[in-house]
Amino acid sequence: MTAPDDNSIITATAPAEVYDKKNPFPSNLKRRVLLNKEGSDKETIHLEMCLAGSGLEYRPGDSLAIIPTNSTQVVEQVIEAGGFDAGETVELKDGATKPLNEAFASDLDINGVTKNILKKYNALAQSEKLESLLDPGNKAALDDYLWGREVIDMLTDFPVPGLSASDFCGTLRKQLPRLYSIASSPKAHPDEVHLTIAVVRYHSHDRDREGVCSTYTADRVSEGETMPVYVHISRTFKLPEDGDTPIIMVGPGTGIAPFRAFVEERDAIGATGKSWLFFGDQHRATDYLYGDEWERYVGDGKLSRIDLAFSRDQEHKVYVQHRMLEHAAEMYSWLSDGAVFYVCGDAS
């Protein structure tokens, strides 16, 4: 080992920052596109997000976790329903303190209600009506109540005069990340990750309601702004190592996302294995997600076959399972030849 002379400069390289669930990466939203055409009953968006400088790596089949914030409207509604002071300082379970409106916006899940949350809340409410609902003999009634209801419903249905904001926060879960199947190949889109998200908006129990994360990505983050994200690795949902292996992919609705990544990846590496895609949605004219891409892949021979099922384009509804039954013999032949079978379902 040689000692440096007096003019030498010794530099140390700082360890690269690791981005994960505890330390998410602020990913810049580069582009957001509505995939459905005019006249559709659905709202499905395509996101392109920047990962440059993050050190985050993913493979087709992995998911991207997004940690959303709650909408200002919902925060204000919950504060009003509970009779709280928005600026009151509250202590969270991790010991942190902050104004209530900030805690509701980013730290706590102020939407979904569970049986456990109702139990914790009733320790404060001491409501006979809620106690009856929680009785083991009333399971059907409890399940019915929990369906489609949220924290604001709990506050209005079982009000507690003078409820402590800090005590109430103790009944809630922390804001959880939402996982979305990645819809891109890093080989096709270096330093980017793409997502396909169904935006949830509906009316239930006399109120307009919305999906927390889907509307966060659609409404509350503008292009050029950032979202906290990290990669969730899949140990099982991945392409076969051998590019000659045939694959069958079934992805109705937003279930198409990982298969866009699969086809892009196989195209990028020059895989020669056959590929067969089943896709379905409501109407071909308005809901054929990434339709131009699929048609191009088929035309170029990069996708061996595609079978489509648009449920509302004829009098009797047709779904992907019907197309699979129609081609059962050929599917069996593919599987006998070693094809790997994948299904990614649309939650709806």
Give a label for each model feature.
Residues M1-S348:
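FNR-like FAD-binding dehydrogenase module
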